[in-house]
């Protein structure tokens, strides 16, 4: 079979959620971010696993994502939408019982006119300058917005992956200035904010990348293994090139495995002649270009060529691969291609 297998450990995702939940006080709820199809790992199955672990509030990017999660979970859990109430979203918000995080005066107006009485939250800009009501706007509308009974006041940290960055304290101060005394539950922290400490926790946290084994949650359990099938093996003589543009040439007689995955499957082209794959615990260098469907790997040092080679797993996390590619683990996870056969179960040692 020429299809790679992406193994996803739902028990590990649930364990990571529980570990992050235990970092906060008992009166602080821990939500779960399942946007972008749970970072590419399958929102329906991931949301089910997190609900079984105890999560009761889920966050998505769009109403369409929210509808998919609601179909998977049924009634009960709250599903919050970061993009708020966009034009054309009214029917989805109503029909799938979604809670938009309203982020502008226009959205406030749209929501109150179209769905007065429907739950909502408010997103405030504490300094990231991306989404949310700015302090001046909030001051102007806080009275009637609070009177309408928001479920949540939230903001987002720009630099929480760097605990020493002064922006963390600046945003904390700005958020408190806008929300102290409102009596409304508040949320400022994703994974990085949880790790900053209790001052950033408020009444709700909403971890994302930490659930899926990523930084900055260094104690997270690994969640994915990506095993790529070897299609063909050939001997390459000294001086012979491999792959497009002849970017790699054999300096000695080499055994080269052609492996079924490429940039169409989410492997960045910047991994060319830089990445490492694994045969069990043994590293094997990627040689030559990453092409659309194929990569080539030097397996000269293996006593026997295996049927598959791992590019993600216990010996190489998405963050490790991202470091090699010059990107971030989020991009590696969310780019994992549709051609992979997804299998849910424990990761083999």
From Swiss-Prot:
Pathway the protein acts in: Amino-acid biosynthesis; D-alanine biosynthesis; D-alanine from L-alanine: step 1/1
One cellular component term from this protein's GO annotations in UniProt: cytosol
Protein's name in the database: Alanine racemase
One of the protein's GO biological processes: D-alanine biosynthetic process
Residues reported to bind substrate: 130, 292
Function, in words: Catalyzes the interconversion of L-alanine and D-alanine. May also act on other amino acids.
Keywords assigned by UniProt, alphabetized: Isomerase, Pyridoxal phosphate
Signal sequence, start to end: none
């Amino acid at each position: 079979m020429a299809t790679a297998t992406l193994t996803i450990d739902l028990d590990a995702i649930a364990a990571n959620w529980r570990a992050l939940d235990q970092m906060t006080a008992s009166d602080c709820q821990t939500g779960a971010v399942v946007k972008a199809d749970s970072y590419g790992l399958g929102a329906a199955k991931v949301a089910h696993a997190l609900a079984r672990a105890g999560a009761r509030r889920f966050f998505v990017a769009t109403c369409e994502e929210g509808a998919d999660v609601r179909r998977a979970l049924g009634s009960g859990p709250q599903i919050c939408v970061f993009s708020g109430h966009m034009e054309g979203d009214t029917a989805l918000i109503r029909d799938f019982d979604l809670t938009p995080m309203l982020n502008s005066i226009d959205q406030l107006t749209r929501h109150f006119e179209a769905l007065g009485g429907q739950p909502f939250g408010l997103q405030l800009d504490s300094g990231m300058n991306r989404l949310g009501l700015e302090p001046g706007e909030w001051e102007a509308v806080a009275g009637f917005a609070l009177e309408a009974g928001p479920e949540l006041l939230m903001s987002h940290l720009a630099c929480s992956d760097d605990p020493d960055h002064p922006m963390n304290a600046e945003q904390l101060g700005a958020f408190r200035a806008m929300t102290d005394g409102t009596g409304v539950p508040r949320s400022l922290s994703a994974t990085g904010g949880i790790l900053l400490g209790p001052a950033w926790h408020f009444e709700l946290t909403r971890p994302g990348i930490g659930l899926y084994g990523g930084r900055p949650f260094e104690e997270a359990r690994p969640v994915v293994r990506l095993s790529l099938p070897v299609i063909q093996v050939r001997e390459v003589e000294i001086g012979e090139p491999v792959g497009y543009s002849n970017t790699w040439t054999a300096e000695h007689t080499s055994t080269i495995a052609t492996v079924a995955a490429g940039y169409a499957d989410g492997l960045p082209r910047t991994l060319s002649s830089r990445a490492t794959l694994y045969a069990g615990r043994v590293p094997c260098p990627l040689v030559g270009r990453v092409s659309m469907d194929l990569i080539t790997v030097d397996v000269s040092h293996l006593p026997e060529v295996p049927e598959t080679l791992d590019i993600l797993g216990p010996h190489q996390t998405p963050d490790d691969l991202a470091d090699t590619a010059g990107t971030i683990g989020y991009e590696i996870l969310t780019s994992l291609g549709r051609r992979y056969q997804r299998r849910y179960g424990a990761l083999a040692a």
